[in-house]
Amino acid sequence: MNSDVSSSEHELSQDGSSQNNPSENFVSSSNSNESVNQVELSDNPEVEHQVKNDSVDTAKEQSSTSCESNIKGSDTEARLQQLEKEHETLNSQYMRIAADFDNFRKRQTRDQDDLKIQLTCTTLSEILPIVDNFERARQQLNPEGEEAQALHRSYQGLYKQLVEVLKNLGVAPMRVVDQAFDPSLHEAVMREPSDEKAEDIVIEELQRGYHLNGRVLRHALVKVSMGPGPKAVNEEIPDQSASNQELSESVDGPTKDEN
């Protein structure tokens, strides 16, 4: 009876150990499967050869994939360098075109300004003789009587308006008397000896010269000193008479004697 109980306990302990250690059972089963597979491969040489071929093909595919990746990487780098060069070339072309356009725009603006000044100079040059006639009339008129003085004041009002318009346009008279002769500003129409003025000094203004915003609008016609010496015969005087007073003084209106 005791022997039967002990044998039963021994069987239960073996069953419990097998149930409590499933990992050991899995390892043992895996080892048994591997041993079976090895036995099968060793027993079947064709299967073993096929497995080896599959391993070689897998290695070749991996090597080929690696080579293709390297080739693609080198191609991408070369393409990137090419694109960078093209970008630099296009950027240089853009900068040149932008600079050319900027120069063209500046040149167009300058040409338009020059054309505008030329047209203004041409127009004002046609008006200046009218100003000269006003000044001559002012010098020659000596109004007597209330009616003549009223007419003279009306005439002076028109003259002042004309002078103001010229000033607003940037026209300014030159100051030439007692100045050194400058061919860029003056045109000498007469020369005569002078004991008071040194040589090449403007003695008299025969026709007023004008500036337009710093440019010469009209040269002044002047008489120039030859320095001390014997009296000389004057050269021909131009048709237009002299205007001895500045344009700004003329704007102030007639003097008390004229009124």
UniProtKB/Swiss-Prot annotation:
Keywords: Chaperone, Cytoplasm, Stress response. Its main location: cytoplasm. One of its GO terms (molecular function) is protein homodimerization activity. Residues 1-75, 227-259 are annotated as: Disordered. Residues 20-40 have a biased composition (Low complexity). GO terms for biological process: protein folding. Pfam families: GrpE. Residues 46-60 have a biased composition (Basic and acidic residues). GO terms for cellular component: cytoplasm. Residues 61-73 have a biased composition (Polar residues). It is found in: Cytoplasm. The keyword Cytoplasm applies. It comes from the Bacteria. InterPro entries: GrpE, GrpE_coiled_coil, GrpE_head. The keyword Endoplasmic reticulum does not apply. PANTHER family: GRPE PROTEIN, GRPE PROTEIN HOMOLOG, MITOCHONDRIAL. Participates actively in the response to hyperosmotic and heat shock by preventing the aggregation of stress-denatured proteins, in association with DnaK and GrpE. It is the nucleotide exchange factor for DnaK and may function as a thermosensor. Unfolded proteins bind initially to DnaJ; upon interaction with the DnaJ-bound protein, DnaK hydrolyzes its bound ATP, resulting in the formation of a stable complex. GrpE releases ADP from DnaK; ATP binding to DnaK triggers the release of the substrate protein, thus completing the reaction cycle. Homodimer. HAMAP family: GrpE (MF_01151). Belongs to the GrpE family. This is Protein GrpE. The lineage of its organism: Bacteria, Bacillati, Cyanobacteriota, Cyanophyceae, Synechococcales.
